[in-house]
Amino acid sequence: MVQQTFTGRKRVRKFFGHIREVAEMPNLIEVQKASYDQFLMVDEPEGGRLDEGLQAVFKSVFPINDFSGASQLEFVRYEFEAPKYDVDECRQRGMTYAAPLKVTLRLIVFDIDEETGAKSVKDIKEQDVYMGDIPLMTMNGTFVVNGTERVIVSQMHRSPGVFFDHDKGKTHSSGKLLFAARVIPYRGSWLDIEFDAKDIVFARIDRRRKIPVTSLMFALGLDGEEILSTFYKKIIYKRAKSGGGSDGWRVPYDPVRFRGYSTLNDLIDADTGKVVLEAGKKLTVRAARQLQEKGLKALRMSDEELVGMYLAEDLVNPKTGEIYAEAGEEITEKSLKALNEEGYKELPLLDIDHVNVGPYIRNTLAADKNMTREDALFDIYRVMRPGEPPTLESAQNMFQSLFFDAERYDLSAVGRVKMNMRLDLDAPDTYRTLRKEDILAVIKTLVDLRDGKGEIDDIDHLGNRRVRSVGELMENQYRVGLLRMERAIKERMSSVDIDTVMPQDLINAKPAAAAVREFFGSSQLSQFMDQTNPLSEITHKRRLSALGPGGLTRERAGFEVRDVHPTHYGRICPIETPEGPNIGLINSLATFARVNKYGFVETPYRKVKDGRVTDEVVYLSAMEEGRYHVAQANLPLDARGRFTEDLVVCRHAGEVLPVTPDKVDFMDVSPKQLVSVAAALIPFLENDDANRALMGSNMQRQAVPLVRAEAPFVGTGMEGVVARDSGAAIAARRSGVIDQIDATRVVIRATEDLDPTKSGVDIYRLMKYQRSNQSTCINQRPLVKVGDIVRKGDIIADGPSTDLGELALGRNVLVAFMPWNGYNFEDSILLSERIVKEDVFTSIHIEEFEVMARDTKLGPEEITRDIPNVSEEALKSLDEAGIVYIGAEVRAGDILVGKITPKGESPMTPEEKLLRAIFGEKASDVRDTSLRVPPGVQGTIVEVRVFNRHGVDKDERALAIEREEIERLAKDRDDEQAILDRNVYGRLADLLENRQGIAGPKGFKKDTKITRAVLDEYPKSQWWLFASPNDKLMAEIEAMRKQYDESKKGLEQRFLDKVEKLQRGDELPPGVMKMVKVFVAVKRKIQPGDKMAGRHGNKGVVSKIVPIEDMPFLEDGTHADIVLNPLGVPSRMNVGQILETHLGWACAGLGRRIGQAVDAYLASAKQETKPLKETLKKVYGDNETIKSLEDHELVELGRNLRRGVPIATPVFDGAKEADIEQMLELAGMDKSGQSTVYDGRTGDPFDRKVTVGYIYMLKLHHLVDDKIHARSIGPYSLVTQQPLGGKAQFGGQRFGEMEVWALEAYGAAYTLQEMLTVKSDDVAGRTKVYEAIVRGDDTFEAGIPESFNVLVKEMRSLGLNVDLHNSKIGDMMPTSEAAE
């Protein structure tokens, strides 16, 4: 059993898992942190940094030479300076949390000898140059950009390397498989090599026009003969000597070559002349092997069997030099006759039998127009740069730069490793460009595939997809910025006087900084962090997206990419993915998975040696795993770790097969390694249908943090891990003793790793009522008392949605599964009034409103209490500066910040001028632009922040806020100082006590003993004056004093820095003089229309809140809190919720029994804990933690368990049906889990027993208050004059085409006309309606809707002139004569 933490002892979970976990789960946000640390490498290690991350970027761009080569700019090293503001300050001020990057550059100027061209160094200058700010990652793996927290999502993309594939027979009508190979570099040109329907091999560069692959080989420097000898074996056919039958050719016999050979004539042994195989038969593999065993060396072939073979070499007349036949030529009867006449005794032929080896490269060579390297290079040049006339030099350079130039082409280490593995090469992974051998090996492998040897690659295999995490994405982005900068530097180096210039003058860091800013601000992968609750944060950081730059697009991604692949096991969660268009493209990392240095996802396994499972854990990537047999984690083992079954089911190369135990190589570490964090939080996941489990994992991320969080009775054991790793709950950084505590901070006096250079005090600031990105409330509260002793890693404060250090997204409520008057029809949820009254599902949401006072061209705007035409009543909650008080209750329409804006002088009539002169009326030239509470919001002001531009006088309110902040900082400083004094003077007293004193403060008698009483006579600051004859002791005291002074100075300095930052003006956007942010806390009780869900995808909307007395109740009078429809279970197949209900019921029953034992203990005079211990032992069995508890800890535990005993049932290894029955029995309940339930309105029992129990319900972030919306008048669209749409724009509801049909069907003509005119876009009519209503009269006439005018304008723009003739309806009626 794991050693429980401080909070873990206060509430112990009963654990149902049977499988011992050997591997520690990696930190859940490691993906983000490790990747970015590797990129930044903030601290330079001994011996300099490795070539990776930022260092590699600088190394790849520098040195930069000018065009003439007379000077060179070299990169020496880089370092980061301290960030200007810390994370919290950045969040408040809307800044980016970043550190300035300082790069040391060296400029070398050369003297070039004009005759010899030799270079000699003339001058070297080194200088530190500022290269922009680089955003830093916070402790929790996020970035603060412009004041908001963002996450950079990792991207899944196709790994660089070579891929072989075919078109599945779709391209050509015959359904023939056309094979293709593609070499994908990390950056650079793509190379495709493909077959066409005629079996000719072509190459394409960057998806351009295709060229024969032989042209590519010519360009690589091969000639025709070399190409043939590379791809085909050569066989020498010798002329057989006459005798033993007719003439023929002697052919060496090779069983592999001749298998499947169909004979035209008899096959004859060349040595004996015997017939080996009669004509017209096929040589089987077995027969071919038997012939070899019988000693067959060679066969005799007749002339006609040579026809159709191809020559391997040029046949040249040695005397005249005349070429009879070229390599690759096909032998015809005519050419064979000619060769026989010339008397050739030996013919070198290509080993092409059209069965095992096809003539594809030979045919391509024959079809290729280009015959020389030059022609081929020109051809490639024309394809890549059409329209430019090629020269040999430019063509050579262009081809060289395509694949062989490290500046433009980079396979990356991954690409090289993958290429070596696929093609069986052994180039070192530092060799990042292509080589001739690589290209030839690719063509060879492709041809082999066409010949039926080998397998094509599966692109969805995780060995062929890799993850680009933050560090790598950032590295690519920064490289782009530096390359933009490089061009500018080169030009500048050539244009300035290089002798007088310093590196600083050559560098403009803007492009690099802009690239970084653009990436964090607007990249598709830089996302606004989902901060609804701690789980949603963690999931967001562990997300893998196939979208984004260089990835897929939603529209083009097919079914295969989105589907679950066998290699996902233990690496990517098969359950958690969004519903909708992104399904399968956005995935989540599995719980135990990690990303290796090459970007492949790895998962841990236990090693199996000789059929025995060891505790050694090995991480394997998908490529490596395919070679082994891997067993499941839940297989039964005996005490020695051997498999108990004779056949073990294993996964091997994507298949599942039974093997004997000695063949097993690895075993899973844990059953939950296959799912993601969110899915691992669902108890009884194994009993839910996958579609519902997907909804369950997605909906847990939308759970709103409640005012009173409560950990689930039925958990999975993952709750503590999530709370700790997400950073929601605060863990102690060092062991120590709690020194001070209040609602906003915890002060710990450290008792371990007391580094003299570090402070001995840890102060943890708690976040109080802060707004999250999703407007939920972040609030932390301490869990410890003064004097508590905590160890490193113990939870000392709970955050949002955490309870005693465990994730608590919802509440345990008493559920009855039964219909109730149709109020739970179609997934509706019926709630008891108790839930509202006791604030069970109440949450706090914090809305932020801001207002800016700008400097306009008519004069500055002003934030003030003095607003024209506003009653004193409306100003009641504003202070003298015009800003709302903290604690004021506000509702829609109330003023939060008073602001007036100057408006332009409108021309005045002489009368007005006279009045203005007499009464001095000046207020009319400003208008009221105050910040008001938007509709639908009401709450309490919890915080106000005022930002002033540098040099603008601060108002009273700003000064008051500043004073408060400085007081808080001073208190922190004083507390830390006090603890420091106590520690130091305590140690000093221990050192001096009982020593001989040879000197001391004024009034101390020399050579007397220093005792505690003597010390207490003097103020502590004078203790340093005591001296003792022991030199070693004095040295120690001196060192201690030095250390103390430094700590004191450091403390004061930190305080002064922070105060200086506070008093300094704020950096505001241009033209803004002052900015005020107001935070309103809104308390949301649950109400009909809110969405709720369980953890099993069982979601619904609250339909009615019923008085407690009307709810169904149990025999003991307990009323149900929530009634769910039983019909929601069978069709959806999420039975997990029923099992959870039963187990929750047992938990509550056991909690009641423990509660009774605690009460008995408190009531008894002797205070005997034995009965309580017995009860706990019955529940928990043999639990180490419970045994180790003191009496008072036992009682506290008992109190905490009163509502219910929390249990953990891990996924795929949880409680079985028998366990649940046993728990119910232990709690003294019916094993069926059903109870007699009475109707709350009549008091009669229902006919059948009802399933009743505790279920964990969440309130989701889809609240009716945010969605409900109504409008009478409001803004209109400019062109169409129709009301805008949507709640955010205060828009109207669209009365669309189908709604019009409905009114037409009713025949409601007047209502319909109103809808389409005066209620929408008839501008004149709208005003008339208003006037009519004001007059109290209800007749109005509809005019021409604006949309008609828009139509007329559109027709005119098409050149159709439409004239409108206005006339009365009567005039338009046909006359009676015309009618007749």
From Swiss-Prot:
The keyword Transferase applies. Belongs to the RNA polymerase beta chain family. The RNAP catalytic core consists of 2 alpha, 1 beta, 1 beta' and 1 omega subunit. When a sigma factor is associated with the core the holoenzyme is formed, which can initiate transcription. NCBIfam families: PRK00405.1, rpoB. Its EC number is 2.7.7.6. This is DNA-directed RNA polymerase subunit beta. Pfam families: RNA_pol_Rpb2_1, RNA_pol_Rpb2_2, RNA_pol_Rpb2_3, RNA_pol_Rpb2_45, RNA_pol_Rpb2_6, RNA_pol_Rpb2_7. It catalyses: RNA(n) + a ribonucleoside 5'-triphosphate = RNA(n+1) + diphosphate. CDD domains: RNA_pol_B_RPB2. It comes from the Bacteria. It comes from Nitrobacter winogradskyi (strain ATCC 25391 / DSM 10237 / CIP 104748 / NCIMB 11846 / Nb-255). Keywords: DNA-directed RNA polymerase, Nucleotidyltransferase, Transcription, Transferase.
